[in-house]
């Protein structure tokens, strides 16, 4: 990867001039000028995912200049470096090879001169055997009963991905009841333990190091609860498995290391659902469906690695997002899935994007003087329409939105799905084209009102429009399609980080709070007044001490 400040490139200067000349562009005019705009500004991936980016504030010239920026910042070398196993996570000295985890070809992928695929495939085979035993009921608990409940204990990448994917693939789930515990707040584990029977429960402890504070606190609580009822520590081996690389700590916990499923330093937490961290996904929907998830991601990987920038879905989405972030000054992007099964999809990519590209230091170690990662948020439609769409439509902030929806529902009840999709189609049309003063007045006249009667109300019913959106329509939410969609967003994030000249695969921003929490924790175990911090922190701690007494 080359360390190029994007703002110093000729393409960036050209984009600034282009923006200055075209910032008053109206989507209404762009569509009026070109009846074939949809054909020019949409792509189909794999025959079952349509990406319509025509409702964006872009022209063919805009895209040409954005592609020039990708070329001038040498995006190609960054893509090649990732797929070739180069140590592009330089602050931690690691390769970034989540693409290896879903490599469904015979192509070797090397890290430090060694092909990682034999180890990847060995872990997948081990996962498959384990899943088959649990799902079939062959695996028995300490009283001879089959497993009915699976509790995944993890946090961050060891939780958000498995939660999102198991929820999204709920139509494919088997009889196993899945539970997820992440928060160190005792309420999370306590409420989960109320729902399960130790005789029929399998706990998955997901921590690469087996030292993560939140995860190990919850795991120890679960183990203590289990032993108290089961009565023998030896039974832990039949009810706990580890997704980890720390064999010594796993064994000391009481887990049989034969039931430890490893992954590697070149797997980042927020990109780890394709690895052993995906065990709860495989247990929930079966290993064949987990493999279909990998296949979908692999096909998107191949598209990303080989397609021209002009026909490359992740690259185009990244460049369009950069256009709003760095030239229009948009601070956030909304991800709005019109599918209730995808209700955790925005939260998953909130982590994926903000932990990856929430950086203010470039790859040269210098503070940047341009905007990097956006704020990511969203909720499923149509719920969001009755919550925050008001601000998107008529507020003062520009919020580019991605709308996602399946053409075919897993639950075709009555006219529910046509009504859902009517809203999906209507929202991007409304955001793009709005409603003019003249249209509002015409509606009032048609309803029998006079303009004099409604003149004070008219301004409030005007929609400016010109709000940009992408529409991502897919045939059905299958494991394969979901895998492709996740990989699409992963690569979008990578492209933006590469162009912004930042490191997208570390997360030093999570460390300071943890360090301070470790310092504060012993102070909470005494009754003495705390004076070692600033007056605000001291005041908060001392008030807590007084109140808990």
UniProtKB/Swiss-Prot annotation:
Summary of the function given for this chain in its UniProt record: Catalyzes the reversible isomerization of glucose-6-phosphate to fructose-6-phosphate.
Pfam families named among the record's database cross-references: PGI
Biological processes annotated in GO: gluconeogenesis; glucose 6-phosphate metabolic process; glycolytic process
Reactions accelerated catalytically: alpha-D-glucose 6-phosphate = beta-D-fructose 6-phosphate
EC number: 5.3.1.9
Transmembrane segments: none
Location of the protein in the cell: Cytoplasm
Pathway in which this enzyme or protein is active: Carbohydrate biosynthesis; gluconeogenesis; Carbohydrate degradation; glycolysis; D-glyceraldehyde 3-phosphate and glycerone phosphate from D-glucose: step 2/4
Molecular-function annotations in GO: carbohydrate derivative binding; glucose-6-phosphate isomerase activity; monosaccharide binding
InterPro entries in the record: G6P_Isomerase, G6P_Isomerase_C, Phosphoglucose_isomerase_CS, SIS_dom_sf, SIS_PGI_1, SIS_PGI_2
Full protein name: Glucose-6-phosphate isomerase
Gene3D superfamilies hit by this protein: 1.10.1390.10, Glucose-6-phosphate isomerase like protein, domain 1
Species this chain originates from: Aeromonas hydrophila subsp. hydrophila (strain ATCC 7966 / DSM 30187 / BCRC 13018 / CCUG 14551 / JCM 1027 / KCTC 2358 / NCIMB 9240 / NCTC 8049)
Main location: cytoplasm
GO cellular component: cytosol
PROSITE patterns tied to this protein: P_GLUCOSE_ISOMERASE_1, P_GLUCOSE_ISOMERASE_2, P_GLUCOSE_ISOMERASE_3
Keyword list, A-Z: Cytoplasm, Gluconeogenesis, Glycolysis, Isomerase
């Amino acid at each position: 990867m080359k360390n190029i400040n994007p703002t110093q490139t000729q393409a960036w200067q050209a984009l600034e001039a282009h923006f200055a000349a075209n910032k008053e562009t109206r989507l209404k005019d762009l569509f009026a000028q070109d009846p074939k705009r949809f054909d020019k500004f949409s792509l189909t991936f794999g025959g079952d995912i349509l990406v319509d980016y025509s409702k964006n504030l872009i022209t063919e010239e805009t895209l040409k200049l954005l592609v020039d920026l990708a070329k001038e910042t040498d995006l190609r070398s960054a893509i090649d470096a990732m797929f070739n196993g180069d140590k592009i996570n330089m602050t931690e000295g690691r390769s970034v090879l989540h693409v290896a985890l879903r490599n469904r070809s015979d192509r070797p992928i090397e890290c430090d001169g060694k092909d990682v695929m034999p180890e990847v495939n060995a872990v997948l085979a081990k996962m498959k055997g384990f899943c088959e035993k649990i799902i079939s009921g062959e695996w028995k608990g300490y009283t001879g009963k089959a497993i009915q409940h699976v509790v995944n204990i993890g946090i961050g990448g060891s939780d958000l991905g498995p939660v999102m994917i198991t929820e999204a693939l709920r139509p494919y789930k088997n009889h196993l009841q899945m539970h997820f515990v992440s928060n160190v707040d005792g309420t999370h584990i306590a409420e989960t333990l109320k729902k399960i029977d130790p005789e029929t429960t399998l706990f998955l402890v997901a921590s690469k190091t087996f030292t993560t504070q939140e995860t190990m606190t919850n795991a120890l609580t679960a183990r203590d609860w289990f032993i108290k009822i089961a009565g023998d520590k030896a039974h832990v081996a039949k009810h706990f498995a580890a997704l980890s690389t720390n064999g010594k700590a796993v064994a000391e916990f009481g887990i049989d290391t034969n039931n430890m499923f490893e992954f590697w330093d070149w797997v980042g937490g927020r990109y780890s659902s394709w690895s052993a961290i995906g065990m709860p996904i495989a247990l929930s929907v079966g290993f064949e469906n987990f493999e279909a998830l990998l296949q979908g991601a692999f096909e998107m990987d191949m598209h990303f690695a080989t397609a021209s920038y002009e026909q490359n879905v992740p690259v185009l989405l990244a460049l369009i997002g950069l256009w709003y972030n760095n030239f229009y000054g948009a601070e956030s992007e909304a991800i709005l899935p019109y599918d209730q099964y995808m209700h955790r999809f925005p939260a998953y990519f909130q982590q994926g994007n903000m932990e990856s590209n929430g950086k203010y230091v470039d790859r040269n170690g210098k503070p940047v003087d341009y905007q990097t990662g956006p704020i990511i948020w969203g909720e499923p439609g149509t719920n969001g329409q009755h919550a925050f769409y008001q601000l998107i439509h008529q507020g003062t902030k520009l919020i580019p939105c991605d709308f996602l929806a399946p053409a075919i529902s897993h639950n075709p009840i009555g006219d529910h799905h046509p009504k859902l999709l009517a809203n999906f189609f209507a929202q991007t049309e409304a955001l793009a084209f709005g409603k003019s003063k003249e249209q509002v007045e015409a509606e009032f006249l048609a309803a029998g009102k006079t303009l004099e009667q409604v003149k004070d109300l008219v301004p409030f019913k005007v929609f400016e429009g010109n709000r940009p959106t992408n529409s991502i329509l897919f045939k059905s939410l299958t494991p394969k399609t979901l895998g492709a969609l996740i990989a699409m967003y992963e690569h979008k994030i990578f492209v933006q980080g590469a162009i912004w000249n930042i490191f997208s695969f570390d997360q030093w921003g999570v460390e300071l709070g943890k360090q301070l929490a470790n310092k504060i924790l012993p102070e909470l175990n005494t009754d003495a007044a705390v004076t070692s911090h600033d007056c605000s922190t001291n005041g908060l701690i001392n008030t807590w001490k007084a109140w808990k007494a």
